[in-house]
Amino acid sequence: MAVRVLLVEDMKQMQGVIVDLLSAVGDFQVVALVATEAEAKLWLSENPDAWDLAIVDLVLDQGSGLAVVPRARDARQGKAEIVVFSDYASGGIRAHCEKLGANAVFLKSESREFMDYCTAFGGLAAAAPVA
């Protein structure tokens, strides 16, 4: 069963890169691709159980991924993973994202570590019993 991904990223080129990375490491299906905080919050409120992994950039066209992370956390109440993948996820920001509910935080320059995380998550999701 494919891992259902909510991708919150405003840069078209980066959207393509992330989709390509996901397809290279496992069975991932991007079920929603949004570019703003408002779009992400709306999608989460309308589709609270339609995703397994949220990948969130912090700097968006409008708004911030920092407001999306807790909304995603509240929507799935620990039943999904939230990963921040951003150029702005340095020291204090990383800790703040984790406090808000992110399971992992990666700089975009840490693409290898991000891929390793997604590979491991995809393997765990594939091994989980279907409810």
Give the role of each language-model region.
Residues 33-53:
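Acidic, metal-coordinating helix/loop segments flanking the phosphotransfer/catalytic sites
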Residues 45-49, 71-79, 100:
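Conserved phosphotransfer cores of two-component systems
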Residues 51, 55-72:
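Conserved phosphotransfer microenvironments
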Residues 84-85:
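Hydrophobic/aromatic residues positioned on beta-strands within the core alpha/beta folds
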